[in-house]
């Protein structure tokens, strides 16, 4: 990590946040979250700042999520830094969600986990032909956090549940079709659009509207009927049964993906989306997600998931437990239960 992991700059009425860890696919750290929080706080009350942009400096990914290798090391050392990261990250998500000034995130390249958490709260979200959007956390023993309980549960039909359980990747056209993105631009147009916004930040919305392009056809519409029918249940056992009863290759592929995921994480994710959809305030959703993450990072699955896919890279995690029917409803309820008052998450500033 260096002082330049995130570049914070303001000029001519525009606040710029540029992620700058290309070798790590711009994975987020606690320090990066703290810097973004400080900048947004300052710019929100500065009358000279008309708009805020979020992008990345270079490379094939906007943001691959939180730096799970650092989280792994923190949990191994039992130094408490992992939980501190999530506390700060969720405050950053909430601050961007409640921001009153126009903001735009350029979702060019990989947008996963914490990257989605940076992008989704922004008023404008620009996808490109290189966008690869996913919430793959159930595959490493976690759950689709950073506001996933809010925005996944509000996607059409059962697309959010499908994404949470399979880690499915969406392209830029899919993101636009689902309102995960508000605009679609070819990658080659981004530099000119950013230049125009830099010169006229007060005209951000008009600049994006004029520059937007028509994406190629989205394939997500072709899958809607299958997704809504086969992922209709809120119990993972019922979803698996529906997929097993279907004879299509697509259903078999979804079963294969779900089989790779941590059973506890899958059950948590489905319940998270049920409860997240019922939240009337984003802060309530984030408080729920902090309760979840504070429990899940202490369970063996997260350590095992990172070991299998990041550290040893044998791609063979041994989940505990290994089967869905071994995860009890009492265990899930305990994961969602309130924390002691002094340990609860709270937003910065307004709710």
Predicted regions and their residues:
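Conserved CoA-thioester-binding segment of acyl-CoA-metabolizing enzymes
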Residues: 1-55, 80, 94, 347-351
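Gly/Pro- and small hydrophobic-enriched strand-loop and loop-to-helix capping segments
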Residues: 122-144, 179-194
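Glycine-rich beta-to-alpha active-site loop
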Residues: 96-140, 162-168, 172
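Hydrophobic/aromatic residues within transmembrane alpha-helices
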Residues: 54, 67, 118-119, 174-175, ...
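Hydrophobic, secondary-structure "cap" segments at the distal end of domains
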Residues: 149-158
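Amphipathic alpha-helical blocks and their helix-capping loop/short-beta junctions
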Residues: 180-261
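Glycine- (often His-adjacent) and acidic-residue-rich active-site loop
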Residues: 56-91, 139-141, 335
């Amino acid at each position: 990590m260096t002082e330049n992991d995130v570049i914070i700059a303001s000029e001519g009425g525009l606040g710029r946040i540029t992620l700058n860890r290309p070798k790590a696919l711009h994975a987020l750290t606690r320090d990066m979250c703290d810097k973004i929080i400080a900048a947004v706080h300052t710019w929100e009350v500065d009358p000279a700042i008309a708009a805020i942009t979020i992008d990345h400096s270079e490379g094939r990914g906007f943001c691959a999520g939180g730096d799970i290798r650092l989280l792994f090391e923190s949990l191994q050392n039992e130094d408490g830094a992992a939980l501190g990261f999530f506390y700060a990250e969720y405050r950053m998500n909430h601050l961007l969600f409640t921001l009153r000034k126009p903001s735009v995130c350029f979702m060019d390249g990989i947008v996963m986990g914490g990257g989605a958490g940076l992008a989704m709260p922004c008023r404008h979200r620009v996808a490109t032909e290189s966008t690869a959007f996913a919430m793959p956390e159930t595959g490493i023993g976690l759950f689709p956090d950073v506001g996933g309980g809010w925005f996944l549960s509000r996607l059409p039909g059962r697309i959010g549940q499908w994404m949470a359980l399979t880690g499915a990747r969406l392209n830029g056209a899919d993101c636009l079709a689902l309102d995960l993105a508000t605009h679609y631009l070819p990658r080659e147009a981004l530099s000119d659009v950013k230049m125009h916004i830099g010169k006229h930040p007060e005209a951000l919305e008009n600049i994006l509207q004029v520059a937007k392009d028509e994406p190629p056809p989205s394939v997500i519409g072709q899958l809607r009927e299958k997704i809504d029918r086969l992922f209709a249940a809120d119990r993972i056992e019922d979803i698996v049964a529906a997929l097993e009863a279907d004879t299509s290759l697509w259903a078999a592929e979804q079963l294969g993906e779900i089989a790779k995921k941590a059973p506890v994480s899958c059950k948590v994710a489905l319940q998270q989306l049920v409860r997240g959809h019922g939240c009337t305030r984003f802060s309530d959703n984030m408080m729920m997600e902090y309760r979840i993450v504070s429990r899940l990072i202490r369970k063996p699955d997260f350590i095992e998931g990172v070991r299998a896919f990041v550290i040893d890279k044998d791609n063979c995690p041994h989940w505990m437990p290994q089967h869905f029917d071994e995860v009890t409803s009492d265990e899930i309820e305990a994961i969602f239960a309130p924390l002691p008052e002094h340990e609860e998450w709270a937003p910065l500033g307004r709710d």
